[in-house]
């Protein structure tokens, strides 16, 4: 009787449209209940029974109920699930398998089975890739997933690497493929094999991209020739190897090992500028004045070179600092080091006055045993030899940026526009409260940005610098020439690492067209998106493996009185994040560890400060002593507390 009643349907429709609803993201807690976060200000309580229909991170629409003046959300419609493809640990065996996602806020096991075509017989503790197939808000009775890929077994020592690479869907090994002979590119190569080119790298480096040669001219100016490995002499555009490199976009450097962009035969041998081996190269010759200015007369050309020495950063630095026992093999090599050192000092001085110089931060190197165990973590400060190479590469990339801009009008450029214009007024207001007066318009120009950066570098601490970082825009990869505010340069195009960066290979092909005087098509925009995405994934993978190894390394320090110096890098409502100075590990100090009385404590992300009873006790960039309270291996998180 009521089945097709239009009045009833209308009433239902009316009730539905009058019921308040909200769209937001589900935030789970460890207590079983959750919240629907609509925006930064508004959230609704989700009771435990309703949480069974959703997962942390799901974007949903929920019906809002009000009972006794208390609002709660009942999930109704799934807009976007948090989990689609994920990695996790398998539980159970035979026909009753489930998988626990590897995520700090997802604790519930999801029933699953091996997908069609997956041969592996899964057992307890296995790591796997899974894809969600069912969701309660899609009309299914429960969550359900398919296991689409076996990663590794529970006790594999290399779990951090294999799981991380699978999580980000990145390659595990070097690409296959060989390049049997060099291409005929119609390039005349200058024979520079007699010159004393040298490479300076880490002692363990096999993929040597760059070799340097310097000489003093009659007028006292210095001439620098930068020779770069030439993979595009072996790899034709559009070939299988080229397409593989295009997809990978970069060599992926992880603690302990790398996954190259090119086959190892090329990256570590045929293209690598090995000592006493004749190699094809793309070269740039520039003349540098005493004040570090690069002359307009820049020459790019194809060459054949033979590196005369594989030098290591530490040896060269020790020798220049008159330390240690290492000596260059002969006077010719010694003279090269001295000239390159002079170039480094004059270029560094030039950049100091006319561009920007980064503050030196140490690199942290994991020393690993045979089974992936962390034997030590070594802070490697950037020494004078690192700076010699850095200054030479920046100079060479600046030359390429100019030549590509002037001759073609395009290339693969690293572009950074400084501050987001939408933030200029807020930035000026913040600086004013700290006694720095900047013009909101001027600070958006390259010159204004450089001026501000120099003022910030002159401050007694990096506190103010850390406060304005949130106003900065991100660096981008673009085919259009544009300024790089972070370096303080009018344009910057890298071509000095073609073995490990696909964008540099593209710039090689463009520079070769310039050398030959040929027309060449502008690179497609989609390649810049692929490179940006790969760079993001590789960085996340490096961070994830690092977190795992730090947790392993510091696990036995939990609960002990071992003190670590730690720099405060961020303050949030829940506490503060610190970086351990000696090894680079990131740890979290929860607010209750800062002060027992919550009402007397104010942790302000906005100001980067922690106040107790109205007085600032901690601020970002402060260095404090901490001890390790706890290491949570399942989430790879390190909890610290201020040392008593």
From Swiss-Prot:
Under SUPFAM superfamilies, the record lists: Nucleic acid-binding proteins
Q: What is this protein called?
A: Exoribonuclease 2
Catalytic function, reaction form = Exonucleolytic cleavage in the 3'- to 5'-direction to yield nucleoside 5'-phosphates
Instruction: Show the GO cellular component annotation of the record.
Output: cytosol
Looking up PANTHER family in the UniProt record yields: EXORIBONUCLEASE 2 (PTHR23355:SF37), RIBONUCLEASE (PTHR23355)
Q: Where in the cell is it found?
A: Cytoplasm
Lineage: superkingdom: Bacteria
Listed EC numbers: 3.1.13.1
Domain RNB span(s) in chain numbering: 189-516
Q: Where in this chain does the record put each S1 motif domain? A: 561-643
Question: PROSITE patterns, alphabetically?
Answer: RIBONUCLEASE_II
- State the family named in the UniProt similarity comment for this chain: Belongs to the RNR ribonuclease family. RNase II subfamily.
